[in-house]
Regions:
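Active-site SXXK
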Residues: 29-47
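A generic, well-ordered mixed alpha/beta core segment in the N-terminal half of proteins
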Residues: 55-128
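Conserved small/polar residues in nucleotide/adenosyl-binding loops
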Residues: 175-177
Length: 177
């Protein structure tokens, strides 16, 4: 197994102190952006309104393996807002966990959105969209209010302007910054 990457160490002012590879190469944050994306859920009041637990917030902030306990957390998040997995637009997937995948295959179950490693993040975005009274079918759209809020948060956390963000759409239908 081979991995490729770059290392950049910078001080608080952004001065490069050490690097391995090109320190100015554009890199998409992908799942590393999930904690920043979850800030929108926290700021929306959805945590309090729907009684979201720390465990449920944690699955919104990270990728998961699609194991039964993780899938149950995502189902609970959705259920607290009166939603179900049909609202998720993260794409269908088998679990990353080989054991969970084998069990689904043994039972003849197809891949589904709950087992997608990003379903927790998507559940959080749905809660944010719902509490703001937004169209739940549009939450992953780049120009949706949910995504605009997230972009503002990322700019604030990273100390950059919107014009400095780069966007792409991946196989999960959601933009990554």
């Amino acid at each position: 197994l081979e991995h490729h990457g770059r290392i950049v160490v910078a001080d608080a002012a952004g001065n490069v102190l050490y690097h391995y590879g090109d320190p100015y190469a554009i890199t998409f944050a992908r799942s590393a952006a999930k904690p920043m994306q979850a800030i929108a859920v926290c700021e929306s009041g959805a945590l309090e309104a729907y009684g979201v637990t720390e465990q449920e917030l944690a699955v919104m902030c990270a990728s998961h393996n699609g194991e039964p306990a993780q899938v149950a957390l995502v189902e609970r998040i959705l259920g607290k807002a009166g939603l179900d997995s049909s609202y998720l637009q993260c794409g269908d997937a088998y679990p990353i966990s080989e054991e969970s995948k084998r069990e689904m295959l043994r039972r003849g179950l197809p891949p589904d959105a709950l087992h997608c490693d990003c379903s927790g993040k998507h559940a959080g975005m749905l809660l944010t969209a719902k509490i703001h009274g937004e169209d739940l079918t549009q939450y992953p759209a780049p120009d949706s209010p949910t995504q605009q809020r997230i972009n503002e948060i990322i700019c604030h956390v990273c100390g950059c302007g919107m014009e400095e963000l780069f966007f792409a759409v991946d196989g999960l239908s959601l933009i990554h910054i």
